[in-house]
Amino acid sequence: MYPESTTGSPARLSLRQTGSPGMIYSTRYGSPKRQLQFYRNLGKSGLRVSCLGLGTWVTFGGQITDEMAEQLMTLAYDNGINLFDTAEVYAAGKAEVVLGNIIKKKGWRRSSLVITTKIFWGGKAETERGLSRKHIIEGLKASLERLQLEYVDVVFANRPDPNTPMEETVRAMTHVINQGMAMYWGTSRWSSMEIMEAYSVARQFNLIPPICEQAEYHMFQREKVEVQLPELFHKIGVGAMTWSPLACGIVSGKYDSGIPPYSRASLKGYQWLKDKILSEEGRRQQAKLKELQAIAERLGCTLPQLAIAWCLRNEGVSSVLLGASSADQLMENIGAIQVLPKLSSSIIHEIDSILGNKPYSKKDYRS
């Protein structure tokens, strides 16, 4: 795992105490007298991000109204969350429009925000997707127009592109950073080998390497974030920004009796999620969640709070991206920070015993 207190570690944490009007927990979850919020370094970069970020996939420009999106962003910002993530492909660009409109309307200082977007699928034309120099530059320009921003803090390559030479992609990312369109760049859903290749190309040609990988991470998907990325962090300083802590809602427990109406699995285009939930493996996962629910009750928290705190307990995770469709849901998820100190080694061991899927690095062969 990652070091606990080295200077370059994403485990470096600080607490912010503010007098902002939005309390970090609603009365339902027990509001503390003072607002506390963790910040971590994004990989070995100097960029400080809140350990919880707000994502816009499915929700912004789609599942929720623009008014609800504004309410969620305001709640997040008032509670110390500074990281907001989107992508050119989310709701065919509308998610970026909604996000940009809210930032403009609220008048928040741009320097207080960390805005990230992802480039790969921009349009239907052959030249409007992928990681060519052309699409990275044109795609990011279009994203910035929709966001009404001069720059994003991190631009992510939303998939690896086997049709584009790695050197071309790394040169294009370096170019948009040098042009002031982005501060940093990262990867999403890339393999360790691909990230390492990008780093090697950057070092060979004196270009800018990626600082972060966006990866799926939850109780049922652990290998990449717990085994592969720690090695990359130690070798080249790439951090982890994780998404789907509730496995698209599976870990929330709402699918234990089937597919509720208006849930994500009931939406058009999410048949894959419905199939996953109703599969034999899905039923096994629901049985494990019932056991985890007992641990959550013992700790005085909800199952989603336990699941998010479990992701945060990994010191290699710089930030966990949350998805929310209601204010109550977001406040409940933010409440996971209160659960984090309760996750003792014995509790973690108990959770691992229930899950039965703890991955081991090749370096652990003696243990």
Curated annotation (Swiss-Prot):
Q: What's in the GO CC field?
A: axon; cytoplasmic side of plasma membrane; cytoskeleton; cytosol; juxtaparanode region of axon; membrane; neuron projection; pinceau fiber
Q: Which UniProt keywords apply?
A: Acetylation, Cell membrane, Cell projection, Cytoplasm, Cytoskeleton, Ion transport, Membrane, Methylation, NADP, Oxidoreductase, Phosphoprotein, Potassium, Potassium transport, Synapse, Synaptosome, Transport
Q: What is its EC number?
A: 1.1.1.-
Does the keyword NADP belong to this entry?
Answer: yes
Which sites bind NADP(+)?
A: 56-57, 63, 85, 158, 188-189, 214, 243-248, 254, 262, 264, 323, 325, 329, 332-333
A single BP term in Gene Ontology: regulation of potassium ion transmembrane transport
Q: Which reaction does it catalyse?
A: hydroxyacetone + NADP(+) = methylglyoxal + NADPH + H(+); (E)-4-oxonon-2-en-1-ol + NADP(+) = (E)-4-oxonon-2-enal + NADPH + H(+)
Sites of the modification Omega-N-methylarginine?
R28
Please name the InterPro entries in this protein's record: K_chnl_volt-dep_bsu_KCNAB, K_chnl_volt-dep_bsu_KCNAB-rel, K_chnl_volt-dep_bsu_KCNAB2, NADP_OxRdtase_dom, NADP_OxRdtase_dom_sf
**Function according to Swiss-Prot or TrEMBL:** Regulatory subunit of the voltage-gated potassium (Kv) Shaker channels composed of pore-forming and potassium-conducting alpha subunits and of regulatory beta subunits. The beta-2/KCNAB2 cytoplasmic subunit promotes potassium channel closure via a mechanism that does not involve physical obstruction of the channel pore. Promotes the inactivation of Kv1.4/KCNA4 and Kv1.5/KCNA5 alpha subunit-containing channels.
Q: What is this protein called?
A: Voltage-gated potassium channel subunit beta-2
